[in-house]
Amino acid sequence: MTNKKAFKEACKFIAGGVNSPVRAFANVQSEPKFISHGKGAYIFDIDGNSYIDYVQSWGPLLFGHCDKDIQKACQKALHKGSSFGAPTLLETELAKLVLSDFPHLEKIRFVSSGTEATMSAIRLARGFTKKDKILKFEGCYHGHSDSLLVSAGSGAATFNSPSSLGVLEDVAKHTLVAKYNDINSVKELFEKNKDIACVIIEPIAGNMGLVPAKQDFLEELAKICKNNQTLLIFDEVMSGYRASYLGSYGINHIQADIITFGKVIGGGLPAAAFASRAEIMDILSPLGGVYQAGTLSGNPLAMAAGIASLTKAKKKTKLYDKLGKLAKKLTQGMKKLADEKGLPLQACHVGSMFGYFFTKDPVSNYQDALKSDLALFSKFHKNMLENGIYLAPSQFETGFICSKMDDKIIDTTLEAVRESFKRI
């Protein structure tokens, strides 16, 4: 069966033909590749084509596809049983592994997805502060729970409308939206609203393309939250163990009240978590009145994969230096080739994460990101795919370097960039 036929058949039985919208390739006016298998830095589609994979399952695969250590850990766990709905030693082992490197985090709760982690963190913050409103930032994505599917609408200083059908206005009205990297927009909202339970932010935004928050912005944000008895939530589902071993904390050293984790923490299996100090976490059921539960939360397969992934990352002390150097080489190379061709391009990286925009101006927030030439991006993406490079099929996603990549792979990629730019 070909990719084209596979997608046509999938559309008959699966809504939209995919189980997550961006996979449909609609943003690049194309159709998805159906993947048969992956190995290291590469994926292979059912037509027999191979690609250097910079999506890496949207971030979880720090060690690439089919890592032997993670596979071995999963096989060992599976041999004992895939799920019990009861505590296992693996849960405590992974909890200790995560918490040991974050002095301000004392307890953790595992869930099965980033959406569950952020949704639970919001509920926890509301339960702890006894306040109703939450503040998020334009362009930051925190999963698809109702209260977080809200955009800026008519402005940062107003209540906002849902950005998805099915999300009630009565839910959306409790979500405030500020401008990313703009502390004044945050101050305005706090001046007008005294019942903000929490501020949730991607300290390294990866869902409007890659846009890091500025250090002074985050420091001032933390002060505002503290002064208003508002909890600060860092959504590190994407950046955790990606930007550095300690995520954004390893870079900005800001101690958020709650951190959400995902992707790498599950080693490629469905796992996520939220963590905080004990006085906050202890109001979760069964100790307190904030309810959160999940049939597969902390399942042994995901815990085993997570332990293997984080243990390996922690042992390989030079891993993040290597990944950062490769990401830097890639983004600087792309920028140089774009300049030579006279194309507008902004490119950056943070650790093993990288992003690029087809615009001449620097990007520091969502409105800047929207200035990117989407038609140019679509042409570039198509050309790169034809040259064997698998990039995220959306301008507003982040790319990832994995440990199986090396200078040769980056050189091959940059040659593909050169050829792709020639055809634009």
UniProtKB/Swiss-Prot annotation:
It is an enzyme of class 5 (isomerase). It comes from Campylobacter jejuni subsp. jejuni serotype O:6 (strain 81116 / NCTC 11828). Homodimer. Its cofactor is pyridoxal 5'-phosphate. This is Glutamate-1-semialdehyde 2,1-aminomutase. The modification N6-(pyridoxal phosphate)lysine is found at K263. It comes from the Bacteria. It is found in: Cytoplasm. It catalyses: (S)-4-amino-5-oxopentanoate = 5-aminolevulinate. Pathway: Porphyrin-containing compound metabolism; protoporphyrin-IX biosynthesis; 5-aminolevulinate from L-glutamyl-tRNA(Glu): step 2/2. GO terms for molecular function: glutamate-1-semialdehyde 2,1-aminomutase activity; pyridoxal phosphate binding; transaminase activity. PROSITE patterns: AA_TRANSFER_CLASS_3 (PS00600). Keywords: Cytoplasm, Isomerase, Porphyrin biosynthesis, Pyridoxal phosphate.
